Amino acid sequence: MNTSPVRMDDLPLNRFHCRIAALTFGAHLTDGYVLGVIGYAIIQLTPAMQLTPFMAGMIGGSALLGLFLGSLVLGWISDHIGRQKIFTFSFLLITLASFLQFFATTPEHLIGLRILIGIGLGGDYSVGHTLLAEFSPRRHRGILLGAFSVVWTVGYVLASIAGHHFISENPEAWRWLLASAALPALLITLLRWGTPESPRWLLRQGRFAEAHAIVHRYFGPHVLLGDEVVTATHKHIKTLFSSRYWRRTAFNSVFFVCLVIPWFVIYTWLPTIAQTIGLEDALTASLMLNALLIVGALLGLVLTHLLAHRKFLLGSFLLLAATLVVMACLPSGSSLTLLLFVLFSTTISAVSNLVGILPAESFPTDIRSLGVGFATAMSRLGAAVSTGLLPWVLAQWGMQVTLLLLATVLLVGFVVTWLWAPETKALPLVAAGNVGGANEHSVSV
């Protein structure tokens, strides 16, 4: 056995790393499932509860509102009280709220419960990515963090399968569909029990003995934590907008929003869009393109390993924008439309791996959860607003203008990435989060 001193950042991948990754991915599987099943449940909920279009939209978007709140609040709390407590609490909340959906009797009940589910998921996004980043070795950190997109997509596709199965002639099937999310959530809650605290966070709090005890227990007595600097001050959300960090905050928030808006808009309304752009069998196109999301996410893992993160993101923004512009210029039903939609689906799924990597690597330990939480919150706010506006935009201006607007959003993401994106690939976590270091690419404006 090798007993020479080695930094935690330089360790080979081991079973403990895989365990933390699997427990983190459980949140993304559940998130994809929760956001996917609601579209099918609303088919039955609309006549059963006599939903108005506004109330149906509120139920559909309530989990995104919760994600916004949970990402901000629980991310900030975890920087103060630790990662492990929120890592466990978030899924207790998700499990309970998911189960209680079975007994909902009014639209307001469902909205409240799905906001609670979203709060749990939002907090878990902030803390899960942070905890995984703080344990992962630098050579494997990108793949581990980026793999969440694959798992999220699997959850989303499983929701489609469950939706087709549950939504039948039984008018109460929606209860079983929504409550079914409690099963994976309960399993994840039980498996997370006993997860250790982040030693990097403990070291930042001056709790040296606890930090080194965790490192020695899970990695060995020869493993060193690295170059974390102890800080006595507590950080607040205004720290993200200080002269030191505002570019990192702006980049991570804007690039996340600019990827999520076209993703959620197109895939929330995929059957409608498929018909509008002239795809003959909307259901077949929807199922095929959902399957392509998994292919794209797997391709993204390979590209994340091969390419610099910054170049991968810049190239993807340009390709996605160009694809939508060409689609907007084609006549409805053009033979090229499906091919371009396949290219768009694969590319956006592939590059979405970076939303799990870049925010977690862009901030130092004492504000990492806060930074990840803020970027996630902004992405969910953008998704909720844009998804809600899509029917109105389609009715007012049509599909051509809608696609051009989405292309504009992607070009904004390109510009912000070019101006402020750091290159964090394969760096020690301390160096990746070091503003002003050799990895900086900020352009003064």
Swiss-Prot record:
One of its GO terms (molecular function) is transmembrane transporter activity. The chain crosses the membrane at residues 23-43, 57-77, 86-106, 115-135, 143-163, 176-196, 254-274, 287-307, 312-332, 338-358, 370-390, 401-421. It is a multi-pass membrane protein. It is found in: Cell inner membrane. Its main location: membrane. Keywords: Cell inner membrane, Cell membrane, Membrane, Transmembrane, Transmembrane helix, Transport. The keyword Transmembrane helix applies. Disulfide bonds: none annotated. Gene3D superfamilies: MFS general substrate transporter like domains (1.20.1250.20). Pfam families: Sugar_tr. The keyword DNA-binding does not apply. Residues 1-22, 78-85, 136-142, 197-253, 308-311, 359-369, 422-445 are cytoplasmic. InterPro entries: MFS_dom, MFS_sugar_transport-like, MFS_trans_sf, Sugar_transporter_CS. One of its GO terms (cellular component) is plasma membrane. Residues 44-56, 107-114, 164-175, 275-286, 333-337, 391-400 are periplasmic. It comes from the Bacteria. Belongs to the major facilitator superfamily. Sugar transporter (TC 2.A.1.1) family. This is Inner membrane metabolite transport protein YgcS.
